[in-house]
């Protein structure tokens, strides 16, 4: 991040069974160490939330003494993949609204931003896991928490991905297809529009409608950096390709 001129960033690990303990015992101590080593980059605690009844969302917590306790509380209680065996009651629209209500009660509430909102769409305006109705309901309940969505999703380096030490896992998963953002035909869905999600890209589309309703609804661009393209992944380093300006 420092190399590519980023002033701030947020770490957003995926959730999973009992992952709140991973955050508490492993990820957070490493974040504290990173803050000491690279103090010139503001580093927020967050996670890629397995959203009840929707696709992923980014949670970004303010830097406070209670930041890790707040994240663990929300993840352990509401992340749909936290429990094992899988609990279907954690994957409902009402569970997501309960999560937002709990976030509102925190002394320093997080921000929530919808990730790759149309990646599971099957066609233009044929939405998948995340829908306009859901995002409106989130913003209705918690307008200072649910504030936006990814306009330009990560995984934009997929076209230049190359295997460094072994056959790329992307090739195993996608074949020779290299859809930007891992949207599109390889997954049976609808591609990005020049690297932008359809909810953002279309004039008069979803983003414009949210703004036209008077909602304060922002878009972001992030790296979704799992594995760098030079190591066979689909990703740039944070700030290497796109940046979010605040």
Language-model regions: role of each:
Residues 1-246:
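Extended, charged catalytic domains and RNA/DNA-binding interfaces, predominantly
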């Amino acid at each position: 991040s420092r190399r590519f001129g980023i002033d701030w960033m947020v770490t957003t690990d995926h959730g999973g069974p009992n992952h709140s303990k991973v955050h508490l015992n492993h990820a957070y101590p490493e974040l504290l160490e990173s803050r000491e080593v690279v103090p010139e980059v503001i580093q927020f605690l967050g996670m890629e939330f397995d959203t009840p009844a929707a696709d992923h969302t980014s949670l970004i917590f303010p830097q406070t003494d209670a930041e890790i306790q707040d994240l663990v509380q929300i993840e352990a209680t509401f992340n749909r993949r936290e429990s094992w065996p899988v609990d279907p009651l954690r994957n409902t629209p009402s569970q997501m609204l309960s999560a937002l209500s709990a976030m509102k009660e925190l002394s320093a509430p997080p921000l929530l931003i919808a990730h790759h909102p149309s990646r599971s769409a099957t066609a233009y305006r044929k939405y998948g896991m995340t829908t306009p109705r859901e995002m409106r309901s989130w913003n209705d309940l918690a307008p200072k928490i649910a504030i936006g969505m990814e306009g330009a999703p990560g995984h934009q380096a997929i076209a230049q991905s190359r295997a460094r030490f072994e056959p790329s896992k992307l090739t195993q998963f996608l074949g020779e297809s290299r859809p930007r953002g891992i949207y599109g035909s390889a997954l049976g869905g609808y591609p990005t529009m020049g690297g932008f999600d359809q909810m953002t890209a279309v004039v008069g589309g979803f983003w414009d409608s949210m703004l036209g309703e008077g909602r304060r609804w922002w878009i972001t661009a992030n790296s979704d950096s799992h594995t760098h393209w030079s190591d066979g992944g689909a990703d740039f380093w944070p700030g290497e390709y796109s940046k979010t300006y605040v």
